[in-house]
A protein has these predicted regions:
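A short small-residue
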Residues: 2-5, 121, 161-171
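Short aromatic-enriched loop/helix-cap "lid" or pocket-rim segments at secondary-structure transitions
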Residues: 48-50, 133-134, 167-170
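A conserved mid-domain beta-alpha-beta active-site/ligand-binding segment of alpha/beta enzyme cores
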Residues: 154-167, 174-188, 193
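Short beta-strand elements in bilobed, periplasmic/extracellular small-molecule ligand-binding domains
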Residues: 34-38, 150-159
């Protein structure tokens, strides 16, 4: 199994999304699959120009000469595609959206011979509420539920409160955090073995680490301290 992961976080491995993405990919490797990871921060990929030349002028070929020329064949051959992104303004990051838009050459109308893929979403946000991910889930479900799609959406690892997770790690309160990280690793193994991620494991990755009011109180105190340090 070949897995292609695209991390859309501008902070790459220092970002909150990597807290879940990296152990998830470790689990995939441990189960025997091959993983290739790219960061949009390191790629030069412009937005789709919408001229449809990849359909009608040069079918299957994008006319823009940038890093998408290297990514497109990898997307085409992957057994599993992992989209990873923090929540930015109720959506994925702009660079990742550009990359996703640029897949147009791979979805030629009437092309029934395309390889079928499984798709996973990994996302993080600083808020407590799991509902913050609803717009991203709506996009994934819309993309991969179309009757002519060659892809299947097989699970989402959604992690709210990621800033809180980092603070808990700094304070040495790693028990609950370790459980979340282990669940992400288990999700990787399960994906390879069973072809999808169970609802049970998805819930373990997303579970609350503290009550809502306590979380936002701690978050406000952290923001106040950050402001004072800048004065």
């Amino acid at each position: 199994m070949n897995v292609l992961a695209i991390n859309g976080s501008p902070r790459m491995d220092e970002g909150n999304t990597a807290i879940i993405l990296n152990p998830f990919l470790d689990g995939i490797r441990e189960a025997g699959a091959n993983v290739e990871l790219f960061y949009t921060r390191k790629l030069k990929i412009g937005p789709c120009n919408g001229d449809m030349s990849c359909w009608f002028k040069n079918p299957g070929k994008c006319g823009q000469n940038d890093d998408m020329q290297m990514i497109l064949p990898k997307l085409k051959e992957a057994d599993v595609i992992v989209w990873a992104s923090p929540v930015y303004y109720a959506g994925i990051t702009g660079p990742l959206k550009n990359l996703m838009d640029r897949q147009l050459p791979l979805i030629m109308l009437g092309d029934a011979k395309s390889k079928k893929h499984k798709v996973v979403l990994v996302s993080s946000c600083g808020a407590w509420e799991l509902s913050m991910f609803d717009p991203l889930l709506a996009q994934m479900n819309a993309l991969y539920s179309m009757p002519d799609t060659n892809s299947e959406f097989v699970g989402a690892l959604l992690r709210p409160m990621t800033e809180g997770m980092k603070e808990m790690i700094k304070a040495g309160e790693t028990g609950l955090v370790d459980e979340v990280v282990q669940a992400a690793r288990d999700a990787g193994r399960q994906l390879v073995k069973e072809g999808r991620i169970s609802e049970d494991i998805q819930k373990k990755v997303s579970k609350p680490l503290m009550p809502r009011d306590a979380y936002y109180k701690a978050a406000q105190e952290m923001m106040d301290q950050a402001k004072k340090s800048m004065e």
